[in-house]
Amino acid sequence: MTNIRKTHPLMKIVNNAFIDLPTPSNISSWWNFGSLLGICLVLQILTGLFLAMHYTSDTMTAFSSVTHICRDVNYGWIIRYMHANGASMFFICLFMHVGRGLYYGSYIFLKTWNIGVILLFATMATAFMGYVLPWGQMSFWGATVITNLLSAIPYIGTNLVEWIWGGFSVDKATLTRFFAFHFILPFIIAALTMVHLLFLHETGSNNPTGIPSDMDKIPFHPYYTIKDILGALLLILILTLLVLFTPDLLGDPDNYTPANPLNTPPHIKPEWYFLFAYAILRSIPNKLGGVLALVPSILILILMPLNHTSKQRSMMFQPISQCLFWILVADLPMLTWIGGQPVEHPYIIIGQLASIMYFLLILVLMPTASTIENNLPKR
C-alpha cells in the first residue's frame, strides 16, 4: 500500500516540502536560519495572541494594561518578555539569513530573494508598530519621529503624515490603527513565507559552493530535520536565558515611563535592530537627504542580483570578496552602536564614515573585487 503521506492531498504538500524534499548534501549550519525564522514567527504569533487578549489600544489605558499583564495575569510577565525578546531573536536570525544569502549568492534565485526582501520590510514594519503599543515615552516619541520622516516627501508629505496619524499628532487613532496592523501583519508574513518557500522549492536550495548539486541530493528528513531541531533547541535556550535573567537587556529604560507629549526624552532612538538604518538616516544633516539614504539602505538588497559581476555564484572561492564582505559585517555593528549614541562629536563623523563605507562596499568595492577575481590568472 502506498504511504499516506505521498497520496493524501494535504500530507503530500507537507511531504514534498519537509520530508522527501531533495536537499544538497553539503549545506552548513548557515542554512538553519530559515527554519529558526519559522519558529520565531510561530512563537511571536502565539505570544502576541495571548497578549492581545489582555491589551487595550487606548492612550489612557495602554500603558496600565501592559503593567496589568506583567503583574496580574498568570505568567503574563513571561509571555510579554518572550514576545519582546522573541522580536530580537527574530531579527538576529533574519540578519544571519540575509548575510548567508549575500555570502553564498542566494540572491541569484530572483523570485525567492525579492519575496525575502518584501518579508524583511513587512517584519520591520510589524516590529516598529509593536514598539509603539506599550505607550511608554520611547513608544510615543519613536512613533512621532519616525512617522514624521514622511513629511520630507515634497508636496504630499504633511498630508500623508496626518493621514497616518489620524489627526494632528500621534494619539488614540494612531495607537488603535497601529495595534490593528500589528495584529494582522504577522499573518500576512506567514502567507508570504509560504510563497517564499514555494519559489525556493521550484529551484531547490543553493549550497556553499554555489555549484548546481542535482546529482548529489539527499532527503530533507531525517538528515536536516535533526539538524534543525538542534538549531531550534539552541535558539530556545538563548531566548529562555534572555527572558529569565536579563529581560530588559535589549529594551529602553525610557519605555517604563508612561508617554508624555509635553516631555521629550533626551535621546530618541528605535529598537536596537533598527539602529544601523537610524545611524544612516542621521548621518545626513538634512531631513529629505536622510530619508533618501534610509530607504536605499535596505532597498539596496533588491539590487544585489544586478550587482553580481562574478563568474562564480558563491564567495567561497573569492578571497578579496570575502575580505570586503567581513568588513561590511563589521561596519553594521559600528552603525548600530552609533545609532544609539547622542548626536555629537565624534559620533557624527564616525556615523558618516560608516554610512559612506556601507554604500561604497555594496555598490562599488564588492562588484569591482568580483571583476578583478574573474580576471586573475588561473593556475
Swiss-Prot record:
What positions does the entry give for heme b b562 binding?
83, 182
Q: Which GO terms describe its molecular function?
A: metal ion binding; ubiquinol-cytochrome-c reductase activity
Cofactor entry: heme b
Which is one Gene Ontology cellular component term of this protein?
Answer: mitochondrial inner membrane
Pfam families recorded: Cytochrom_B_C, Cytochrome_B
| UniProt-annotated location(s) | Mitochondrion inner membrane
Q: Give the UniProt record's GO annotations in the biological process aspect.
A: mitochondrial electron transport, ubiquinol to cytochrome c
Described function: Component of the ubiquinol-cytochrome c reductase complex (complex III or cytochrome b-c1 complex) that is part of the mitochondrial respiratory chain. The b-c1 complex mediates electron transfer from ubiquinol to cytochrome c. Contributes to the generation of a proton gradient across the mitochondrial membrane that is then used for ATP synthesis.
Name the record gives this protein: Cytochrome b
Q: Which organism is it from?
A: Pelea capreolus (Gray rhebok)
